[in-house]
């Protein structure tokens, strides 16, 4: 599905932008999931808000939380495990949603790809954390995320912490050196066979 993306700080959001974002979050996370929880939090002030639009209508959304933000510090303070520590020192992506009528067309992957791309540009080589609902583990794994916590309940819904680390690239130099060694060995064998053939002909 083709759509347009907008990335804004909280202060750059218009009142209309904010209305549609909060409406969508309430529709998906409160009404659809039948989960009464406090969606509007003070974390929004420090986030970047990524919105997917089609014909000027919000159809998808997520927010990017900076490393060491208030939310990250709060989570780390509440827990002593390594998962909270990782999330507290890295950027994270949250409140990922697609409105029901636009699901199944790859839009969630597009939004996550855009969010990851921005995190890499803004925060460099830091890992990227998410708190994923467990039924979406395979989707996030397909983007490179791996679980790093036990399952836990958050607002009555099962979640797991996941992280996207930079993949180590195999150095082309090592690949070339292996190929060179094989090629040199084959040339040596051919040279020996050639010399053996000459000796045989001379005798």
Regions found by a protein language model. Give the residues of each.
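Conserved catalytic-core motifs of GNAT/GCN5-like acyltransferases
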Residues: 129-131, 141, 146-161
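Conserved N-terminal entry element of GNAT/NAT acetyltransferase domains
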Residues: 1-16, 171, 179-199
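Conserved beta-strand in the GNAT
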Residues: 51, 57-67, 72-82, 92-97
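C-terminal "cap" of GNAT-fold acetyltransferases
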Residues: 153-186
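Short hydrophobic/aromatic beta-strand element in the GNAT-like acyltransferase core
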Residues: 35-38, 47-51, 61, 95, ...
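Conserved GNAT acetyl-CoA-binding A-motif
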Residues: 112, 119-133
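Conserved acetyl-CoA-binding loop-helix of GNAT-fold acetyltransferases
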Residues: 98, 104-117
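Short amphipathic alpha-helix that is part of the acyltransferase structural core
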Residues: 1-57
